[in-house]
């Protein structure tokens, strides 16, 4: 259902407020450069520091600006099942094509708790839902066997697998077959994950290099594995640079250097250290982004 290059778009701020004009410009930058779908209010969109009204405003602005040209998948995850249901309902009402649901963070549910959490959301809201496993940020790893229990639900269509583990992604694909699509959650392993059967990537890198990420997934789908492999290797250095500090600090710093939007992030995130900014600047110059 959702495949290819899917950008986890940043939320631009100016003087502490969501910059709606810049957000619309970023959406156009993505669509112009071949991005297949857009995710507002994911990890990269700083969803955890948006209040409820801001969260829904960002989702609505992206849906309005996209105007049905590509799918919009709203980040609606929460460590409260009730809140995730409410956000998912509101996203559906706003016209989202799907929702992205991060595993509950901080409260560390058991695997049974994860099954009950996701089943409750899928039962409550009839919209295509993408599970999101990112244990490095949430403190809980959703095991392949747990994904296999959820995969038969008609509203659960995919998983964003961001453990960085090809073994775990492969186990999900082996267990679930065609019941659920797998999407890479890490730019630096998109190509090998697609070789295992993933359908694309929910990408941080696409914020600054949308065409390169789209070209990689397009080449793979066209059977041009050599081009896809070359793009994978060529973008590896800058993919890794997007994580020299906590996401989205590097990608927002990069967008600031490109003049696309402010590099402003919300506390407890803070501006990139001068040393890392110098390293990032040098890498961006190598890629002729600035």
UniProtKB/Swiss-Prot annotation:
GO molecular function term, any single one: 4-hydroxy-tetrahydrodipicolinate synthase activity
CDD domains in the cross-refs: DHDPS
Pfam family, one: DHDPS
Subcellular location per the Swiss-Prot or TrEMBL entry: Cytoplasm
GO cellular component, one term: cytosol
Site, as annotated: Part of a proton relay during catalysis: 43, 106
Its EC number(s): 4.3.3.7
A GO biological process held by the record: diaminopimelate biosynthetic process
Pathway annotation: Amino-acid biosynthesis; L-lysine biosynthesis via DAP pathway; (S)-tetrahydrodipicolinate from L-aspartate: step 3/4
Record's keyword terms, sorted: Amino-acid biosynthesis, Cytoplasm, Diaminopimelate biosynthesis, Lyase, Lysine biosynthesis, Schiff base
Keyword presence, Iron-sulfur: no
Superkingdom, taxonomy of origin: Bacteria
Segment forming the signal sequence: none
Catalytic activity field: L-aspartate 4-semialdehyde + pyruvate = (2S,4S)-4-hydroxy-2,3,4,5-tetrahydrodipicolinate + H2O + H(+)
Active site (catalytic residues): 132, 160
UniProt-annotated binding residues for pyruvate: 44, 202
Keyword Signal assigned: no
NCBIfam families documented for this protein: dapA
PANTHER family: 4-HYDROXY-2-OXOGLUTARATE ALDOLASE, MITOCHONDRIAL, DIHYDRODIPICOLINATE SYNTHASE
Subunit structure: Homotetramer; dimer of dimers.
Family from the record: Belongs to the DapA family.
Role, per record: Catalyzes the condensation of (S)-aspartate-beta-semialdehyde [(S)-ASA] and pyruvate to 4-hydroxy-tetrahydrodipicolinate (HTPA).
Name used for this protein in its record: 4-hydroxy-tetrahydrodipicolinate synthase
High-level lineage: Bacteria, Pseudomonadati, Thermodesulfobacteriota, Desulfuromonadia, Geobacterales
Gene name tied to this protein: dapA
